[in-house]
Curated annotation (Swiss-Prot):
GO terms for biological process: mitochondrial electron transport, NADH to ubiquinone; mitochondrial respiratory chain complex I assembly. Belongs to the complex I subunit 2 family. One of its GO terms (cellular component) is mitochondrial inner membrane. The keyword Ion transport does not apply. InterPro entries: Complex_I_Subunit_2, NADH_DH_su2_C, NADH_UbQ_OxRdtase_chain2, ND/Mrp_TM. Core subunit of respiratory chain NADH dehydrogenase (Complex I) which is composed of 45 different subunits. Interacts with TMEM242. Core subunit of the mitochondrial membrane respiratory chain NADH dehydrogenase (Complex I) which catalyzes electron transfer from NADH through the respiratory chain, using ubiquinone as an electron acceptor. Essential for the catalytic activity and assembly of complex I. It catalyses: a ubiquinone + NADH + 5 H(+)(in) = a ubiquinol + NAD(+) + 4 H(+)(out). This is NADH-ubiquinone oxidoreductase chain 2. It holds the Pfam family NADH_dehy_S2_C. Keywords: Electron transport, Membrane, Mitochondrion, Mitochondrion inner membrane, NAD, Respiratory chain, Translocase, Transmembrane, Transmembrane helix, Transport, Ubiquinone. One of its GO terms (molecular function) is NADH dehydrogenase (ubiquinone) activity. The chain crosses the membrane at residues 1-21, 25-45, 67-87, 111-131, 144-164, 178-198, 201-221, 237-257, 274-294, 326-346. The lineage of its organism: Eukaryota, Metazoa, Chordata, Craniata, Vertebrata. It comes from Myotis simus.
Length: 347
């Protein structure tokens, strides 16, 4: 892609997200979402092949439908209250429609079907942006209207998302789809605690994004997109493959890695608020995520047939500039739990 075009696309995408995060007017929020959606489509079709085109089309249709639903909710609320303000979401119909629109943009169940299909059809870098940066705008919208929406609907959707995120990844061999289902499950955890403690949702987001970035960066170094190719790179790049597997276990929530910290904090917060059944179900469903990540680790490293590697091992990375931040990201993705006593929100 032309560097000038790339810089314009990235700037527009960031501007759209910032407009959503800083606006209190429904029309400006809609404009921010539209800027965000139109800016990322060139990144999705960066590789000119039918699969990328299909993924971009699915993404566009889903996001356009969600934007239409968002505008319908805003207009319905305008007719009822006479205000465009985000804090005047009083009409119950408008509130439900707005929740549906934002969760569709976020990829929560039952509006999750586009996430694995789109992620599978695009390059790894575009998938990284889709599963990290593109979550910020709808999450900020839900964060702002949280006191005004039906929490029961959100809790049901979050529980469904955790279940779908676990079940969907069980029979997958494509790493991009596995990351997509993991993203759906993580969004479910964030939405579950949003009704109890929105700050805990931000903590979960701050941990989820570095873990996802680390995993995608390591996959890009390895040029790996399937579990089969991941197991074949063990002899060529054992260190990188080991780091991928450890980061994946962290994404699954295995203690004492970083991914366990937000799950433990969310369960603790919900238990403090006299909610017992919900965190119990969430914990049981989270075992599905941990199971398929553990299975990938087991089949990749412990059941590999011993083979002699006659090639010269090349330890240098493909792009040194891109990998300068990788050691820090790996530390954040694996070694944060010992710092938990220093976090006031957890004490």
């Amino acid at each position: 892609m032309n560097p000038l075009t790339l810089s314009l696309v990235l700037t527009t995408m960031m501007a759209g997200t910032l407009i959503v995060m800083t606006s209190s007017h429904w029309f400006m929020i809609w404009v921010g979402f539209e800027m965000n959606m139109l800016a990322i489509i060139p990144l999705l079709t960066k590789e000119h092949n039918p699969r990328s085109t299909e993924a971009a089309t699915k993404y566009f249709l889903t996001q356009a439908t969600a934007s239409m639903l968002l505008m319908m909710a805003a207009i319905t609320n305008l007719l009822y209250t006479g205000h465009w303000s985000i804090m005047k979401l009083i009409n119950p119909t408008a509130s439900i429609m707005m929740t549906m629109a934002l969760t569709m943009k976020l990829g929560l169940s039952p509006f999750h079907f586009w996430v694995p299909e789109v992620t599978q059809g695009i390059p790894l870098m575009s998938g990284l942006i889709l599963l990290t940066w593109q979550k910020l705008a709808p999450l900020s919208g839900l964060y702002m209207i949280m006191p005004l929406i039906n929490t029961d609907i959100l809790l049901i959707m979050s529980l469904m998302s955790i279940a779908i995120g676990g079940w969907g990844g069980l029979n997958q061999t494509q790493l991009r789809k596995i990351m997509a289902y993991s993203s759906i499950a993580h969004m479910g955890w964030m939405m579950a605690v949003l009704a109890y403690n929105p700050t805990m949702t931000l903590l979960n987001l701050y941990i989820y994004i570095p873990m996802t970035i680390t995993t995608f960066m390591l996959l890009m170094i390895n040029s790996t997109t399937t579990t089969t190719s991941l197991s074949q790179t063990w002899n060529k790049l054992p260190l990188i493959t080991t780091l991928i597997l450890i980061t994946m276990l962290s994404l699954g929530g295995l203690p004492p890695l970083t991914g366990f910290l937000p799950k433990w904090a969310i369960i603790q917060e919900m238990t403090k608020n006299s909610s017992i059944i919900m965190p119990t179900l969430m914990t049981l469903l989270a075992l599905l995520n941990l199971y398929f990540y553990t299975r990938i680790t087991y089949t990749t490293s412990l059941t590999m047939f011993p083979t002699a590697n006659n090639m010269k091992i090349k330890w240098q990375f493909k792009n040194p500039k891109q990998m300068m931040s990788l050691p820090l990201m790996i530390m954040i993705s694996t070694l944060v739990p010992p710092l938990a006593p220093m976090m006031p929100i957890l004490t």
